[in-house]
From Swiss-Prot:
The UBC core domain, residue ranges: 29-196
EC number(s) recorded for this UniProt protein: 2.3.2.23
Record region (Disordered): 1-29
Coiled-coil blocks: none
Name recorded for this polypeptide: Probable ubiquitin-conjugating enzyme E2 ECU01_1010
Biased composition (Basic residues): 1-10
UniProt keywords, alphabetically: Transferase, Ubl conjugation pathway
Active-site annotation: 120 (glycyl thioester intermediate)
Family note: Belongs to the ubiquitin-conjugating enzyme family.
Known function: Catalyzes the covalent attachment of ubiquitin to other proteins so as to signal them for selective protein degradation. Involved in the formation of multiubiquitin chains.
Length: 216
């Protein structure tokens, strides 16, 4: 009878993650998870639906769950109120063992967003990553219990309440600290221009704009 070697060990989660292919297809478990998240987002609380919309790429018959378009639609006294901001979220094959990445497509002028659109937020960081410009408590780093909703809601908080102690955009951080009135004008100007561009060029953004109008 075959006996397993005493020195043989079972694969650990770290081993599985290392084998993840960022450009490969989603694992079946990841596909199921993201499909379920899509359904939950459709029945989200009304107040949350007013803050963002999230859509996997592709048609209903041919979904690409690896890439999602995120549309932020903040209201109230936000500097982005009435505007649409777009970001793209990309998922690794092993999601949720590893976090997705998020990058703004809309041009942003914000202390916690790099000029290339990358977002600095602890919820998207793995334990092994050490980035001093990441916003958030280190205890809040990525775990598999996080999801699209928790990520986006964390970003909403940062958009409205920048943290200048660990900036990704130094110019935005300095202006926010030393010349807040000018910062407000610049953010509003850029948000308006990016919103107008999205509505002209992005069919999904136009659908989001119609939803915003219907809810107001």
């Amino acid at each position: 009878m075959f006996k397993p070697s005493a020195h043989r060990r079972l694969p650990r989660e770290d081993d599985i993650i290392q084998e993840d292919d960022e450009d490969g297809p989603l694992w079946p478990s990841a596909l199921r998870r993201l499909s379920n998240e899509e359904e939950r987002l459709k029945i989200a609380d009304g107040d949350e639906r007013k803050l963002f919309s999230a859509y996997p790429r592709g048609s209903m018959e041919n979904r690409d769950y690896k890439v999602w378009d995120i549309y932020f639609t903040l209201g109230g006294d936000s500097l982005y109120a009435g505007r649409i901001l777009k970001a793209v979220m990309k998922f690794p094959s092993s999601y949720p063992l590893r976090p997705p990445t998020l990058k703004f497509v809309s041009k942003m002028f914000h202390p916690n967003i790099y000029e290339d659109g990358k977002m600095c937020i602890s919820i998207l960081e793995e334990d092994k990553q050490q980035d001093s410009s990441v916003f958030g408590d280190p205890k809040d780093k990525w775990t598999p219990v996080q999801n699209i909703r928790t990520i986006v809601m964390s970003i909403v908080v940062i958009l409205n309440s920048p943290n200048i102690s660990s900036p990704a955009n130094v110019d935005a951080s300095v202006m926010y600290r030393d010349n807040p009135e000018e910062y407000i004008k610049e953010v509003i100007r850029i948000a308006r221009e990016e919103d107008e561009k999205l509505r002209r060029t992005d069919p999904q953004a136009r659908e989001v704009a119609l939803q915003m109008k219907a809810e107001n």
